[in-house]
Amino acid sequence: MEKLTILLLVAAVLMSTQALMQEQRQKAKINLFSKRRLSAESWWEENGCSLWGPCTVNAECCSGDCDETCIFGS
């Protein structure tokens, strides 16, 4: 009976360790993608252009193509 109790405790510790490591990996991925998004947003803000917002001239669009709204990918 003692061996079974020890085995169950070891299994519980291993499972909680695995869950903790998996959670840390997910947080690291979220941080990585957040940093990428923020750096892309800051690039657009620094260049003063918009991806798909309203515009009056081509220079307001990152794509350089304005037709009342920025046309992305042209």
From Swiss-Prot:
Gene Ontology CC entries for this record: extracellular region
Q: Which UniProt keywords apply?
A: Cleavage on pair of basic residues, Disulfide bond, Ion channel impairing toxin, Knottin, Secreted, Signal, Toxin
Q: Does the keyword Oxidoreductase apply?
A: no
Single annotated GO MF: toxin activity
Q: In which tissues is it expressed?
A: Expressed by the venom duct.
Q: What is its main location?
A: secreted
* InterPro entries on file: Conotoxin
Disulfide pattern: 49-62, 55-66, 61-70
Q: Which residues form the propeptide?
A: 20-34
- Domain comment quoted from the record: The presence of a 'disulfide through disulfide knot' structurally defines this protein as a knottin. The cysteine framework is VI/VII (C-C-CC-C-C).
Report the protein's function.
Inhibits voltage-gated ion channels.
Name this protein carries in UniProt: Conotoxin Vc6.8
Q: Which organism is it from?
A: Conus victoriae
